[in-house]
Design a protein with these regions (language model features):
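FAD/FMN-dependent oxidoreductases across multiple families
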Residues: 1-78, 82-86
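C-terminal helical "tail/cap" subdomain of flavin- and related membrane-associated enzymes
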Residues: 58-160
């Protein structure tokens, strides 16, 4: 039974801001979530990425020695470098999918063709271990390099 009206939305564009590259950062300002990186919501990564960013913030805030101090550049830079590592994975996954459509505008990642080819091979595999590892990567439980182990490569390409 329909419980309400059906609503559609349009996603205008993905944006990533590289705060980790700033030489100076406004003291006392914290930037997280979509303010740093807004990817296509179709992939459902926003909350997970924001939670991982919050953990990176907690790690960096623990480095502040006195309670009540504002966030000095000495903390801001390591924090943004930490979240850049988180965003690299999310961004590559989401943008890589977006760019398979010809209507997507912008500069394709250098690794697009190779990543797309490999992802297609992983998706075509009928090996349950490959599928399990793929979903662990997609849900940020494991880094993408876990799909590149000799065992996973064998299971992806040789075992059908």
């Amino acid at each position: 039974k329909l419980v309400g009206e059906i609503h559609s939305f349009k996603f205008k564009k993905a944006i990533r801001r590289h705060f980790e590259e700033l030489k100076k950062f406004p003291e006392g300002l914290v930037v997280l979530g979509d303010a740093v990186c807004r990817a296509n919501p179709f992939f459902g990564q926003g909350i997970t990425v924001a939670a991982l960013e919050a953990l990176a913030l907690e790690k960096n805030l623990k480095k502040i020695s006195r309670s009540g101090d504002s966030i000095p550049m000495a903390i801001a830079r390591p924090f943004f470098k930490d979240i850049a590592k988180i965003l690299d994975v999310s961004w590559e996954m989401a943008v890589g999918e977006d760019f398979k459509y010809r209507t997507t505008k912008g500069r394709r990642p250098v690794t697009f063709a190779l990543t797309r080819w490999f992802k297609d091979k992983v998706m075509a595999s009928n090996d349950p271990e490959v599928a399990k590892q793929f979903y662990r990567v997609m849900h940020f439980a494991e880094p993408p390099t876990k799909l590149l182990t000799p065992k996973m490569l064998y299971r992806t390409f040789m075992k059908h």
